[in-house]
Amino acid sequence: MAISSYFRLVKAGWVLMREGVTRLADPEQLPPSGQFAIKVLRMFEKGSVKQANNAERLTQALNRLGPSYIKIGQFLATRPDMVGKEIAGNLSLLQDRLPEFETSIAKEQVEAAFGKPCDELFESFSEPIAAASIAQVHKGTRRNADGTTREVAVKVLRPDIRKRFKNDLDAFFIAARWAEFFVPSLRRMRPVAAVETLERSAELELDLRLEAAALSELGENMEDNPNYRTPDVVWDFMSRDILVTEWIDGLKLSDLEGLQAAGYDLQELANEVINSFLTQAVRDGFFHADPHQGNMFVTEGGKIVAIDGGIMGRINEGESRFLAEILWGFINREYMRIAQVHFDAGYVPARHKVDDFAQALRGIGEPIHGAQADDISMARLLQQLLDVTDLFDMPMQPQLMFLQRTMVVAEGVARSLDPSFNMWEAAEPVIKDWISREVGPAAHIRRAANGVNALGKLVGDLPELAARAEKLSAEMAEVGEKGLRLDPETLRAFSGDESKSAKVTAYGLWAIAIAVGALAVVMWQG
């Protein structure tokens, strides 16, 4: 790990101090050493931040630090277990908006990708329509082979963004590893795994070909829904840095007055937002993970078009089943069923009792039944469910935390359309359909067929497996007789790596101490 990564952490700590982020910590809840650290760190604040609220301090600091920190801020908004509920709530207000870069630079990016002048590729190419941390969007016009023209959206990656993300992620990994080493209580939250998830997400988001594929997959999955779709991708105009899709003319879901004036039923739109999200998550295991109002348009006929496939979520069949079983259990007040699902998934250590966990779940679920529709929040229920994880020693599941954050966003959009929206009434048909398909007789027949196929494959592989086992047995016998031998080059490599690692650790200790000093007092309460 380059020494520059340590200095990036120091810089981040300095910016956080200057923007007054340490004021998110309550000194009264800190030990004397922490209270002293707060006083020292606040001496470096800018005078202008003293009147700002916590959300403003956080967003200003992360915007100053750049795209990578905006992304990690959005990610930590899904991890209240790591940063505390208040900080997570403040981070949820963080908007992925940055100043545009010049249109001339965007045109250069297009020309570099396709080897032709931008004016030959597009009959028109607008100034930026929207700009975020990863890319910005322009409106263009292309001439089709038959002479007609077509309006398109041209998404252009920011120049040098990959290099910047890589450098910042190196620093994030250092911070996560040291956090796990020095703060044992954080190990349950798996900060290194969280950064790995962020890294993978960034890799996918920084290749616009994968975003095109994601939009295509989501569109195919939702083909049977007449009220939801994604933009068509212009496949013959594709590169890693450029994404071209059809231009969507419609009303954003945030334009409530416009939607009402156009005669759309806001309650139906709210229901479709949740119906489509749960269908994606529960049935398909692949969902649009950034479903805010600006990413959804309503087109003629009331069809919702979801744009921006840069952030997608994927959960496996077991995790989809886990989600569906939980929601169905709460709908029907089957708390023992929910508890058993947690134990079957291995999320709760076997030393705990299923009955005790079911009792805790009852305390979460019962207040929901009989409550007013506008007091019922599926996202809040899932958050309360996460709150009991510490009591039952449950390790955090980053992919499920990501799903929970997305559900919070989707629910917020639905309630902005219809404040009295009933989440459970909207969820029940989707979950009921899943239960009938996955737990009913047809599902048992399908699983039995899959089992027969797997058994047949195993029988076919037996000769090869037997040969491998015989070879391994001979090699193990040789090791037992002669000992484990390493060639000289390998030994020298081990020695060199160890020496370099020791030097980097020694150089990094003080750098980490400075950076963590700015962050630890905030994390203490999380």
Model-derived regions, located:
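Hydrophobic residue at the +6 position relative to the catalytic HRD Asp in the kinase catalytic loop
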Residues: 294-298
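Residue-level signature of catalytic and energy-coupling elements of molecular machines
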Residues: 73, 137, 154, 211, ...
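Residue immediately N-terminal to the catalytic "proton-acceptor" Asp
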Residues: 140, 284, 289-291
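N-terminal accessory/targeting segments that precede structured cores
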Residues: 1-136, 142, 164-195, 414
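Helix-rich C-lobe and terminal helical cap/extension of kinase-like folds
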Residues: 26-33, 46-48, 52-53, 196, ...
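Juxtamembrane "helix exit" motif at the C-terminal ends of alpha-helical transmembrane segments
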Residues: 288, 415, 513-526
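Glycine-rich ATP phosphate-binding loop
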Residues: 139, 150-157
